[in-house]
């Protein structure tokens, strides 16, 4: 309502014509009452310490008062003042002053017009271009690594297995005692038979201590050819051809040892490995041959074997493969054979440069960058997250490599050209052209970088246009070769690089990723610093020009901002005179809230800046002035302006601003709500982007495994094939040898030849005893054998009984036969017969018919002759019986000795004298 009343009072003439008279009178009465109330308020000037709310309320009250005064066109007591020259000293009361804020950095001060020091602004600043001068070229990069995979080639081994098998036999079982295998090399003359006809001989000989020992297949004692057939066992790397799949063994006699021989020709087609520098090679079985696989008898390749056992055959004819008689043949330009004690090894000799390559392609980078540093080149690949560092010395891939008699890079040159052409046609054919020739560099990590530079077609056309118009165009790619001047002639020099220390080169690829990380960080930091330096220089240049021009308007403020402290300055021609400002008593400063100028109660003009009253330090005199920028007090109150309608002014004091509406204080405004004029030059710095490193595998697991010439897998597989090839005897020979026999055999063999012979004898006896015992035990445990044994026991008991009952008939069988009559020496009839010498006289009676009656004398009476015999007589009788037994046995022996052989006719004629005797006449069944 007060603002409406104020506007109504200011335009009363126009408003009276358009509104009713009653409203005009009511406004005048209201304004008069407010002016009287304000004039009656007494005032002193205390140190006001009101907050923002009280100040706002005071401002609203005083706004209404000033409006009423204006309406009545009367001078208000607040504007009663005295004029001293051009300075108006205002009257101050507690409702029209306020305390300033933020005087720490910019205290209240008075800057004098008199200056003593002279300063000036410099000339225009020249900004240096900080663009890096590092030449950069884009292109195609192919990276090659050292080939660590071993050279693998085919090797044929020839040997004969002389297999000796020993066994022992008793009555029921054959015992297998063991096998010994002797490997013997093929003689060189027999290799032709094997390689050309797929046959080998069945005999083998060996010289031991100057003696020749010969072994024959199946103990045949014949030397004939046998056909090679493929063995049942095979592997990925080896094929075996043999002549004997089943082993022969001759059974032993009972209680005897036997040993048989099998001759097996074995041809193995296998693989061998050799790695740089190719001084030896290793077979899949683990055999090491100290000869370079490329030694041909004329070159300087390593050779450490016995030359007497080494042969090289030129244009050698042999089978393409073994196992078939009808297999085709081939001609080998160079075939090498090495004879050892246990085998003969053969392999084909190839030129080294045709079958080996020291380098292998690792990565193809279609978009690569080459930067030229002071000491070398950096080949950067963002796709690989790697940087390869190389010297500027190029490698000539068209010349012979130092230390070798051939060019080691020719094997990769064609591949590189093909790869570069493929990438160029696929990605760059429409936009780029090739820049320069193919270049080769050796990196610090032992890699080979093949580089093909590229150039955009637009730049290429610009260079061609400049060349036609004799205008030089600076390119980013510097010359890659150095030149020396001799006698006015430019001579290009290139030094060969030695690869003798190739083994000392570190092949770890992690260094390349570390180098890439460093290059990325370096480029990022350098770009940021370059942007900062450029922005800083441009800002300094602009600021200097602006300050120079602004100093012509307000030199004090400009220099205060430059020196960051309050100073006073004024122009003195083309220079500036500067001096320090004088501080005032900070607690005595009062800022008035009303900026209007009244005369006779009427607003006649307005101050352009707020009024200030203050006191100097150590002074009690009240001074007046106007508030300048940053709390500067400008002496005098002559800075006025015409009052504007709807005026709004904000005066900055520290971090806040005093807001005046229609030249009267309204409130304290925070500067945060007032937008700043953006004079900051943008700093082009972006956060470092994330880089995920790729896992670069320079050599795969397969390559690392293949680089080792000793392949454990192949050696074990070859060993297993040998193990499976050893078979036991067939069912004819049972391996159930008792442990004690094996132990005894081992013990006796350890004693030498004599012990071996003793062992054979002991083994025979022990084996016989063991066989008998085992036979008896087996016979008794058999039912039939047990029954037979019982019958035999019964028979033996019967015989014993008969012997016991008839001892004379058993012991003296001839006593029951018809005896020859003994005639007495004196005649046919005599007294007592004369018996054997020393025998007692025997009485014999002879009948008239010539019959003997003596038997009756012994048998007629059971008591016999009534005669008593002494022990001496019994002894004489036993002796006589012994003599009689001996004479009978001798007689039978003489009859057998004198008996002539008789045939069937003699037997029929009756001339057989085989022991038959004619019966006596009295005993004959025939009558005469």
Swiss-Prot record:
A biological process term (GO) from this entry: virion attachment to host cell
Residues on Intravirion side: 805-928
Membrane-topology annotation of the record: Single-pass type I membrane protein
Transmembrane segments: 784-804
Any one cellular-component term (Gene Ontology): host cell endosome membrane
Membrane keyword on record: yes
Matches recorded under InterPro entries: Glycoprot_B_PH1, Glycoprot_B_PH2, Glycoprot_B_PH2_sf, Glycoprotein_B_ecto_C, Herpes_Glycoprot_B
Region (Hydrophobic membrane proximal region): 729-781, 740-780
Protein keywords: Disulfide bond, Glycoprotein, Host cell membrane, Host endosome, Host Golgi apparatus, Host membrane, Host-virus interaction, Membrane, Signal, Transmembrane, Transmembrane helix, Viral attachment to host cell, Viral envelope protein, Virion, Virus entry into host cell
Main subcellular location of this protein, as a coarse class: virion
Region described as Disordered: spans on this chain: 40-79, 826-863, 887-928
HAMAP family: HSV_GB (MF_04032)
Function: Envelope glycoprotein that forms spikes at the surface of virion envelope. Essential for the initial attachment to heparan sulfate moieties of the host cell surface proteoglycans. Involved in fusion of viral and cellular membranes leading to virus entry into the host cell. Following initial binding to its host receptors, membrane fusion is mediated by the fusion machinery composed at least of gB and the heterodimer gH/gL. May be involved in the fusion between the virion envelope and the outer nuclear membrane during virion egress.
UniProt-recorded name of the protein: Envelope glycoprotein B
Species of the source: Murid herpesvirus 1 (strain Smith) (MuHV-1)
Gene that encodes it: gB
């Amino acid at each position: 309502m007060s603002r409406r009343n104020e506007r109504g009072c200011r335009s009363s003439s126009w408003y009276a014509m358009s509104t009713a008279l009653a409203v005009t009178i009511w406004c005048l009465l209201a304004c008069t009452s407010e002016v009287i109330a304000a004039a009656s308020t007494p005032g002193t000037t205390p140190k006001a310490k009101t907050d923002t709310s009280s100040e706002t309320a005071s401002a609203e009250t005083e706004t209404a008062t000033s409006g009423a005064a204006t309406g009545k066109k009367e001078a208000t007591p607040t504007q009663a003042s005295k004029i001293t020259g051009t300075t108006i000293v205002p009257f101050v009361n507690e409702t029209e002053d306020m305390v300033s804020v933020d005087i720490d950095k910019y205290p209240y001060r008075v800057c004098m017009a008199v200056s003593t020091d002279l300063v000036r602004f410099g000339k225009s600043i020249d900004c240096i271009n900080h663009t890096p001068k590092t030449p950069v070229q884009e292109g195609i990069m192919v990276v090659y690594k050292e080939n660590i995979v071993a050279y693998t080639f085919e090797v044929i081994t020839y040997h004969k297995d002389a297999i000796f098998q020993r066994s022992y036999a008793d009555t029921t079982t054959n015992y297998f005692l063991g096998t010994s295998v002797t490997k013997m090399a093929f003689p060189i003359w027999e290799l032709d038979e094997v390689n050309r006809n797929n046959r080998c001989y069945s005999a083998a000989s060996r010289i031991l201590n100057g003696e020749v020992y010969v072994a024959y297949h199946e103990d045949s004692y014949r030397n004939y050819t046998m056909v090679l057939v493929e063995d049942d066992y095979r592997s990925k790397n080896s094929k075996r051809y043999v002549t004997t799949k089943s082993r022969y063994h001759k059974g032993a006699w009972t209680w005897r040892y036997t040993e048989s021989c099998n001759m097996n020709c074995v041809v193995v087609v296998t693989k061998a490995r050799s790695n740089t520098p190719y001084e030896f090679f290793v077979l899949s079985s683990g055999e090491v041959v100290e000869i370079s696989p490329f030694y041909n008898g004329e070159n300087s390749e390593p050779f450490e074997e016995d030359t007497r056992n080494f042969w090289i055959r030129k244009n050698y004819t042999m089978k393409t493969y073994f196992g078939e008689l009808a297999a085709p043949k081939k001609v080998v330009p160079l075939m090498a054979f090495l004879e050892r004690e246990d085998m003969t090894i053969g392999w084909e000799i190839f030129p080294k440069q045709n079958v080996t390559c020291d380098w292998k392609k690792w990565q193809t980078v279609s978009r690569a960058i080459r930067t030229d540093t002071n000491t070398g080149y950096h080949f950067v690949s963002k796709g690989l997250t790697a940087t390869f560092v190389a010297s500027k010395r190029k490698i000539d891939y068209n010349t012979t490599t130092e230390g070798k008699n051939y060019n080691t890079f020719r094997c990769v040159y064609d591949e590189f050209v093909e790869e570069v052409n493929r990438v160029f046609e696929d990605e760059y054919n429409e936009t780029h052209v090739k820049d320069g020739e193919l270049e080769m560099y050796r990196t610090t990590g032992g890699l080979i970088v093949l580089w093909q530079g590229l150039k955009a077609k637009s730049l290429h056309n610009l260079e061609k246009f400049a060349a036609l118009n004799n205008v030089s165009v600076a390119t980013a790619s510097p010359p890659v070769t150095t030149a020396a001047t001799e006698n006015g002639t430019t001579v290009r020099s290139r030094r060969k690089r030695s690869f003798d220390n190739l083994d000392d080169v570190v092949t770890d690829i992690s260094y390349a990723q570390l180098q890439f990380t460093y290059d990325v960080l370096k480029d990022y930091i350098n770009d940021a610093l370059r942007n900062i330096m450029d922005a800083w220089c441009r800002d300094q240049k602009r600021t200097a020009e602006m300050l120079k021009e602004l100093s012509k308007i307000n030199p004090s403020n400009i220099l205060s901002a430059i020196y960051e402290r309050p100073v006073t300055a004024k122009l003195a021609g083309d220079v500036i005179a500067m001096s320090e400002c004088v501080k005032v008593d900070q607690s005595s400063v009062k800022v008035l809230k009303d900026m209007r100028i009244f005369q006779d109660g009427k607003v006649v003009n307005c101050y352009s800046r707020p009024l200030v009253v203050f006191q100097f330090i150590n002074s009690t005199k009240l001074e007046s002035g106007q508030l300048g920028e940053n709390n500067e007090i400008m002496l005098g109150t002559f800075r006025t302006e015409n009052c504007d309608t709807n005026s709004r002014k904000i005066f900055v004091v520290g971090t806040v601003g005093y807001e005046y509406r229609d030249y009267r204080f309204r409130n304290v405004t925070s500067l945060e709500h007032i937008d700043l004029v953006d004079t900051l030059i943008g700093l082009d710095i972006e956060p470092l982007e994330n880089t995920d490193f790729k896992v670069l595998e320079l050599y795969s697991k397969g390559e690392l495994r293949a680089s080792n010439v000793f392949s454990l897998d192949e050696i074990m597989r070859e060993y297993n094939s040998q193990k499976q090839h050893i078979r036991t005897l067939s069912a004819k020979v049972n391996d159930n040898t008792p442990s004690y026999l094996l132990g005894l055999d081992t013990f006796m063999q350890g004693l030498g030849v004599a012990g071996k012979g003793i062992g054979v004898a002991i083994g025979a006896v022990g084996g016989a005893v063991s066989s008998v015992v085992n036979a008896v035990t087996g016979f008794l445990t058999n039912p039939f054998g047990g029954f037979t044994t019982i019958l035999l026991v019964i028979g033996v008991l019967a015989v014993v009984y008969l012997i016991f009952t008839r001892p004379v008939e058993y012991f003296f069988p001839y006593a029951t036969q018809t005896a020859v009559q003994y005639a007495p020496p004196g005649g046919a009839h005599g007294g007592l017969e004369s018996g054997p010498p020393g025998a007692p006289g025997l009485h014999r009676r002879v009948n008239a018919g010539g019959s003997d009656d003596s038997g009756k004398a012994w048998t007629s009476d059971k008591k016999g002759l009534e005669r008593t015999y002494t022990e001496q007589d019994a002894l004489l009788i036993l002796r006589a019986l012994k003599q009689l037994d001996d004479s009978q046995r001798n007689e039978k022996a003489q009859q057998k000795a004198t008996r002539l052989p008789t045939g069937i006719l003699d037997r029929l004629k009756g001339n057989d004298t085989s022991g038959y005797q004619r019966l006596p006449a009295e005993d004959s069944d025939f009558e005469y």
